[in-house]
Regions:
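Structural preference for solvent-exposed beta-strand-turn elements
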Residues: 1-445
């Protein structure tokens, strides 16, 4: 039987301090890299389905992992130190990040490995086969899972040009180059999240250069023989913080402090967009801003605001900095004054579900005038005075966690009676989401 969450009442005004779960992208990268280090790494990671999939894959590759209290102890045997048998199958669950980064550790695998995922992941593009082929790896059925991969003993460094701003493809190339290829690997790509670069530079001490050009970055990494184990407390995820942030912003007479969040410039695109929509420091502000191991960490203060302005998002905006938050941004635009336009977002339809289409569908459902722009954009006629009073049903059968949480925020902030299917999908990134909503005073069943 499909599970459903019910929301029948707006959230009351609140004034709270909360924490959000650890950064999912950073948690997966830390776990994967710890498996290649020499010695035992001690990591405080996100506890979610995607991280469990990551750790289960590493265990099947022969990595010893123990959890003690809130910390994972991952015992690496060095680069290419995996120990596994032939005909191995690795289940990536729902994690596109894991699917695309794990193969970078397997470039020298002597055996064929099969990578699979759940129903949603099996429809998503694999993407990293082409750069890994240049390193020397072999693939069959390399478009969507299941993917079959075999490594090579003769890995060569590459120069890879990437037209889209994809932190995952960039990371896959950087890890494969640093850990397996002698010489210098270069990645030339549009700017994207620098999570991996910060780990290399500030935590693992892997030599690299970042050359910033007008429209792209050129990143160079030199192949290494080994690196030491490390300790890391992963900070809060901006993508998770976005939900209570928007809930507070769109609710009435509420204030919230979200503590210990990763606010690296390439992660805070939603705040950059909200600034352009008139959200000043009075309504969203960073407090206790500091830099820890290359990442900017802050407590985010947010309070309710009822006069958002429409936005025409420029082509120059780095969409990758808000790629997981655009459905929330569309919801904010729906309650702003004026006509908002968002373009060049075709990447949204390559996520767990077609999120650009979902954004259009949700806004039409609640009575917002909305128009599609080709296959890449959306135009939204905002209505600040709209009150939601009808019954709404979200049949989230592809189990997209961000659709479930975005529509929950919409119902809690602006009313209506909501039935949202497949709430278990939330466990992918934010297992404590419903608990957090209840702590803020929301009625969600």
């Amino acid at each position: 039987m499909n599970k459903i969450i019910y929301i029948n009442k707006k959230i009351n005004n609140f004034k709270k301090k909360i924490f959000v779960p650890e950064d999912k992208s950073l948690s997966i990268r830390c776990a994967l890299l710890a498996s290649q280090a020499l010695g035992k790494s001690r990591l405080k990671l996100l506890d979610s389905e995607d991280i469990r999939s990551t750790l289960n894959c590493l265990r099947r590759l022969g990595v010893r992992i123990i959890k003690q209290n809130d910390y994972y102890h991952i015992e690496g045997r060095g680069i290419n130190g995996f120990n596994f048998k032939k005909n191995l199958v690795l289940d990536c669950g729902n994690s596109g990040t894991l699917l695309r980064l794990l193969p970078s550790l397997l470039v020298r695998s002597p055996y064929k490995i099969k990578l699979i995922g759940d129903k949603s992941l099996s429809k998503r593009n694999f993407r990293v086969a082409e750069p890994l082929k240049h390193f020397g790896a072999q693939f069959s059925n390399n478009k969507t899972p299941p993917v079959y991969m075999k490594g090579t003993y003769f890995v060569r460094p590459i120069t890879w040009r990437e037209d889209i701003a994809s932190a995952q493809i960039k990371t896959c190339c950087l890890i494969a180059g640093a850990l397996h290829a002698p010489g210098i690997t270069k990645v030339i790509a549009r700017p994207s999240r620098r999570t991996t670069e910060n780990l290399f530079k500030h935590v693992l001490k892997i030599p690299m250069k970042i050359l910033k050009r007008k429209n792209y970055d050129q990143i160079e990494v030199r192949g290494i023989n080994q690196f030491k184990s490390f300790n890391y407390n992963v900070p809060g995820d901006m993508s998770s913080a976005a939900y209570p942030l928007v809930l507070t912003l769109l609710s009435k007479k509420s204030e919230l402090i979200i503590k210990n969040v990763n606010v690296c410039p390439t992660r805070i695109g939603i705040i950059t967009i909200l600034r352009k929509m008139g959200v000043t420091q009075k309504y969203i502000k960073f407090r206790n801003l500091r830099v820890v191991k290359g990442e900017r960490i802050a407590n985010i203060f947010v309070k309710s605001m009822n006069n958002l302005k429409a936005i025409n998002l420029p082509k120059s905006f780095n969409n990758s900095s808000a790629i997981d938050e655009f459905v929330l941004i569309f919801i904010c635009a729906a309650f702003s004054k004026g006509i908002s336009t968002f373009r060049y977002l075709e990447e949204l339809n390559k996520k767990e579900s077609k999120r650009l289409d979902w954004g259009y569908k949700i806004l039409k459902m609640i009575g917002i005038k909305t128009k599609k722009i080709g296959n890449h954009g959306i135009k939204i006629w905002g209505n600040p005075n709209l009150e939601l009073k009808k019954n709404y049903v979200i049949k989230n059968y592809l189990k997209d966690h961000r659709i479930a949480m975005s529509t929950a925020v919409l119902g809690l902030a602006r009313g209506g009676s909501w039935k949202i299917y497949e709430p278990d999908s939330i466990k992918t990134s934010f297992p404590s989401f419903i608990k957090m909503i209840k702590e803020l005073g929301g009625k969600i069943n």
